[in-house]
Amino acid sequence: RVRHPVINAWYKSRNYHDDHGEGMDFYKVGTGRGCGGIGVFNAGACFTSGNWVTQNHLASGPVRTVFELTYAPWACGNGVTVSETRRVSLDAGSHLTRFESRFTLAGAASVAGGPGLDISAGHLHNGLLATDPEQGWLANYEPAQTGKGSICTALVLPHGGTLATDAQGCVYLLGTL
């Protein structure tokens, strides 16, 4: 709605789920993977990281904000551990956020993993899911919320993958890590 950056002010005030004339971010992640949280599928189960443990602010300007998040190694079954460093780029005026992840594995040469999109009714993300795993995308259009509007979340990868779903209802687009 506005042509000036609002993210810093929203997060500083801790009030970004309500519209005060500049729009809002009413997407609630809760304990789910949200939009883009990584899942590793190994030993017949999905394994996810905890919250990030370190952050590094790389750039903050009128056009782009960039930061990196580091996640502690997490166990992924059969003696495999994975750690992640994720770079997040937010461009002013864009409806998309860029995530670039680097993974370190121990205990295996590779595992199946990738970003997820929470479509569970338990997290109020019970929308209309569309996918094209061969083209590398999935999207969820959620029903309108009174006083807030609608939200659409999507994942777009530079390559195709295969779909997998975890026990909580999050759908993942998997590749090889």
Sequence positions of predicted segments:
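A recognition module on extended beta-rich or small alphabeta surfaces enriched in W/G with H and D/E
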Residues: 131-162
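Beta-strand-rich recognition/accessory modules
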Residues: 153-177
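Extended, loop-rich substrate-binding clefts of extracytoplasmic carbohydrate-active enzymes
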Residues: 8-93
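Solvent-exposed beta-strand/loop surfaces of large extracellular or lumenal domains
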Residues: 75-79, 123-136
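Acidic (Asp/Glu-rich), glycine- and aromatic
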Residues: 84, 95-130
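Short, hydrophobic/aromatic-enriched beta-strand segments in well-ordered soluble domains
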Residues: 67-71, 115, 153-154, 177
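Generic recognition of long tandem-repeat/solenoid scaffolds
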Residues: 65-70, 136-140, 173
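An acidic-aromatic substrate-binding cleft motif
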Residues: 1
